């Protein structure tokens, strides 16, 4: 709370864990507790939540592509009873930023995307491909630069 009270920024991974699965998991309550805790101690604050989508082309290999997408800032309503609403707003915002493959078709969909070399870090490209339209971008190998990108 001290950082927030001094108009600092705090990075929180609200899902509370990581997974190789390309979908949004339930968000933990920690980020709303921090925001409302800071507001309780310092009511003149105007905290904002900025959704950040982080996606990897290859989770298990070095030198893969990483796409970081920032969403629009979401103001924290001063009323602490709105914490659940804030969580849902952030969850919805994240779904607009990252690839979110439904569980029901996950294995088939992911296999189809990878076999067709669709950039699985690009939400628009994935949605475009899944709509049945031809893709405009494919992931390219970096040739001799491979495995050097992460070591710079």
Question: For each of these PLM feature ranges, what is it?
Answer:
Residues 1-152:
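Non-catalytic C-terminal accessory region of glycerolipid acyltransferases
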């Amino acid at each position: 709370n001290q950082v927030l009270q001094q108009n600092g920024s705090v990075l929180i991974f609200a899902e509370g864990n990581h997974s190789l699965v390309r979908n949004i998991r339930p968000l933990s309550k920690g980020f709303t507790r921090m925001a409302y805790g800071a507001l309780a101690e310092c009511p003149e604050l105007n905290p904002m939540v900025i959704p950040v989508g982080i996606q990897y082309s290859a989770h298990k290999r070095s030198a893969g592509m990483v796409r970081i997408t920032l969403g629009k800032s979401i103001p924290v309503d001063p009323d602490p009873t709105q914490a659940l609403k804030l969580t849902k707003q952030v969850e919805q915002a994240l779904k607009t930023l990252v690839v979110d493959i439904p569980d029901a078709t996950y294995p088939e969909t992911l296999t189809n995307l990878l076999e067709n070399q669709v950039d699985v870090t690009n939400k628009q490209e994935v949605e475009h491909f899944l709509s049945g339209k031809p893709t405009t971008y494919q992931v390219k190998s970096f040739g001799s630069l491979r495995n050097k990108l992460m070591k710079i």
